[in-house]
Design a protein with these regions (language model features):
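Flexible coil/turn and secondary-structure edge motifs
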Residues: 2-3, 21-203
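Bacterial N-terminal signal peptides
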Residues: 9-21
Length: 203
């Protein structure tokens, strides 16, 4: 038993040494990327990104406005300037920001201004909130490429990321906590029907 414990202790020490060596070589701990998108109802956006390999966490919240610590009721009434949005933590070694942009575009109606499907109001506007200049350039390039596909102008904004306020807990992972209600809402809102019109059937 003691020899097993010693071997286990040695293994743990080696793992710690390896991690310390890796950090010393890079000069920083492993990086996690952050992406922020608004695409209408955050229940649906969160559900779509939860399916993407390389996404670590998704958080529903509010951003893009002026009110501090807004509530769902305040944002729903408009006047806060905030949009329902999702903040995504991802592993850049497993999924690129370009891939996240592609997922975003194919799960929204980019032609709708201040609305998405059955939901209307500036809180449902679509936007890409960039966190650095590289994200800004990639977002703009993807929007420009997409515009060539449509006659109508793309309404999606590309704006700097600002404070992100986490939504109430009952909104987090709503699709997993309340699958029947979520599917009922998504179907009746016409989200997937409109997405199929825009992008074709998903594989």
């Amino acid at each position: 038993m003691r020899s097993v414990i010693r071997r286990a202790g040695l293994g743990a020490a080696l793992l710690l040494a390896f991690a310390a060596s890796a950090m010393a070589q890079t000069g920083e701990p492993p990086k996690t990327g952050i992406a922020t998108f608004s695409g209408g109802c955050f229940w649906c956006v969160e559900a779509d990104f939860d399916k993407v390999a390389g996404v670590i966490t998704t958080t529903s919240g509010y951003t893009g406005g002026h009110a501090v610590n807004p509530t769902y009721e305040q944002v729903s009434r408009s006047g806060t300037g905030h949009a329902e949005a999702v903040e995504i933590a991802y592993d850049p070694a497993k999924v690129s920001y370009e891939k996240l942009l592609d997922v975003f575009w194919h799960n929204i109606d980019p032609l709708a201004k201040n609305a998405q499907f059955c939901d209307h109001g500036d809180q449902y506007r679509t936007a890409i909130f960039y966190h650095d200049d590289q994200q800004r350039r990639l977002a703009q390039a993807s929007k420009d490429a997409l515009q060539a596909r449509f006659e109508d102008p793309i309404a999606t904004q590309i704006v700097p990321a600002g404070p992100f306020y986490k939504a109430e807990e009952y909104h987090q992972d709503y699709h997993a906590k309340n699958p029947i209600r979520y599917k009922f809402y998504r179907f009746n809102c016409g989200r997937d029907a409109r997405l199929e019109q825009l992008w074709g059937k998903k594989d």
